[in-house]
UniProtKB/Swiss-Prot annotation:
Superkingdom of the organism of origin: Bacteria
Catalysed reaction equations from the record: an acyl-CoA + acetyl-CoA = a 3-oxoacyl-CoA + CoA
Alphabetized CDD domains for the sequence: thiolase
Gene3D superfamilies in alphabetical order: 3.40.47.10
Family of this protein: Belongs to the thiolase-like superfamily. Thiolase family.
Root EC class: transferase
PROSITE patterns the UniProt entry points to: THIOLASE_1, THIOLASE_2, THIOLASE_3
Enzyme nomenclature, EC number: 2.3.1.16
Gene: fadI
Protein name: 3-ketoacyl-CoA thiolase
Record keywords: Acyltransferase, Cytoplasm, Fatty acid metabolism, Lipid degradation, Lipid metabolism, Transferase
A UniProt-annotated Pfam family: Thiolase_C
HAMAP family: FadI
Length: 436
């Protein structure tokens, strides 16, 4: 094992995660229909600051992410600062790392803290799959640019006459990889076939996720970390995730048809995470700054790692690559963890990564490591359910996982937790958290 890389400031301060909060997560075109991501971000950051009672000028930086970006608000972070009553001099910029976006936001704020340029910052992300940047065809876009430069009506009419009827159709955001044309579900199907993951195994994991998430809500474990929201016309509160199917049975999952490989596939809408709207954020500080303000941190960021692999085959293996690196940098092993939380983009992807974490062959032949990262104990794995149940607003999921894991660690008396996610483009992210 290589030497650990402690995440501390020049003064020896640990990176404290003081608090975290999220909106309820809503299935596409339901509770947050018509609410853009920037407004979801304002909701969660405004409420997070109000609950924390931290002076507004104590926050020196806000790093926020959005995967499905809206052209009218390209820097969502700055819009959140300006729309929440934060100090207008607060540094704010946006990041995007697909499904690991808020992991990246947290890492960026942590690096600013370690560099000594700030002492407190906010990291998070928001996405809306209900408010989308619906575009136009390339042919129409080109004509519109040329029409804007045309000088006469005749020139404009000539340009428009070149268009065909199909060129006028709206173009929704792409759901496929730019470089390969593969959809995420196609990759999940690849992984199911490569690693021999059955439909029954996928449905069982999805059912487990929903059951555990429903139980977490029923036991009141999520109430402190999920805010109540009100949206126009402001008559009814929206306070709980609306994707969780607590009353479902395994037989219900078996009824669904494959969503991607229609003839021979096993990936369905039920064993995949749905399109979702929501936002989440966390406040980070140096340990000494938290003490100055009289705050008791939820926990600390012990390490993080980002990795990348090829996109043509089984590209959602990010957790199998990033987990051993994050553990190594934390000076820990799998056995040292109290909790292990993995983003469930698809049940097939989740099960494939779990399989490879325990594989000696994968460790030696692919990672170049002497031994496997380690089997993940089921009693430590996604104990409150995962993204299949809660949903997945792309840029918000990492902050949800971090906050949720730290709260659960504290309920268990402290310890170490690892959160990890795959992401489009063959990317992976993992973070080791510590609670006392």
């Amino acid at each position: 094992m290589r030497q650990a890389l402690p995440l501390v400031t020049r003064q020896g301060d640990r990176i404290a995660i003081v608090s975290g909060l999220r909106t309820p997560f809503a299935r596409q075109a339901t509770a947050f229909h018509g609410i853009p991501a920037v407004d979801l971000g304002k909701m969660v950051v405004g409420e997070l600051l109000a609950r924390s009672e931290i002076p507004a000028d104590a926050i020196e930086q806000l790093v926020f992410g959005q995967v499905v970006q809206m052209p009218e608000a390209p820097n969502i972070a700055r819009e959140i600062v300006l729309g929440t009553g934060m100090n207008v001099h607060t540094d704010a910029y946006s990041v995007s790392r697909a499904c690991a976006t808020s992991f990246q936001a947290v890492a960026n704020v942590a690096e600013s803290l370690m560099a000594g340029t700030i002492r407190a910052g906010i990291a998070g992300g928001a996405d809306s799959s209900s408010v989308l940047p619906i575009g136009v065809s390339k042919a129409l876009a080109r004509v519109l640019v040329d029409v804007n430069k045309a000088r006469t009506t005749r020139q404009r009419l000539t340009l428009f006459s070149r268009l065909r009827l199909r060129d006028l159709l709206p173009v929704p955001p792409a759901v496929a990889e730019y470089s390969t044309g593969l959809r995420m579900g196609d990759t999940a199907e690849q992984m199911a076939k490569t690693y021999g993951i059955t439909r029954e195994q996928q449905d069982a994991l999805a059912h487990r996720s929903h059951q555990r998430a429903a139980q977490a809500w029923a036991e009141g474990k999520l109430a402190e970390e999920v805010m109540t929201t009100y949206v126009p016309p402001y008559k009814n509160p929206f306070a709980e995730d609306n994707n969780i199917r607590g009353a479902s049975t395994l037989a219900d999952y078996a009824k669904l048809r494959p969503a991607f490989d229609r003839k021979h596939g096993s990936v369905t809408a039920a064993n995949s995470t749905p399109l979702t709207d929501g936002a989440a954020a966390v406040i980070l500080m140096t340990e000494s700054r938290a003490k100055e303000l009289g705050l008791h941190p939820l926990g600390y960021l012990r390490s993080y790692a980002f990795t990348a692999i090829d996109v043509w085959q089984d590209m959602l293996l990010g957790p199998a690559w990033s987990t051993p690196l994050a553990l190594e940098r934390a000076g820990l092993t799998m056995a040292d963890l109290t909790l292990f939380d993995m983003h469930e983009a698809f049940a097939a992807q989740t099960l494939a990564n779990l399989q490879l974490l325990g594989s000696e062959r994968f460790a030696r032949e692919v990672l170049g490591r002497a031994q496997a990262t380690g089997e993940v104990d089921d009693a430590k794995f996604n104990v409150l359910g995962g993204s299949i149940a809660y949903g997945h607003p792309f840029a918000a999921t990492g902050a949800r996982m971090i906050t949720q894991t730290l709260h659960e660690l504290r309920r268990r008396g402290g310890g170490f937790g690892l959160v990890t996610a795959c992401a489009a483009g063959g990317l992976g992210a993992a973070m080791v958290l510590e609670a006392e």
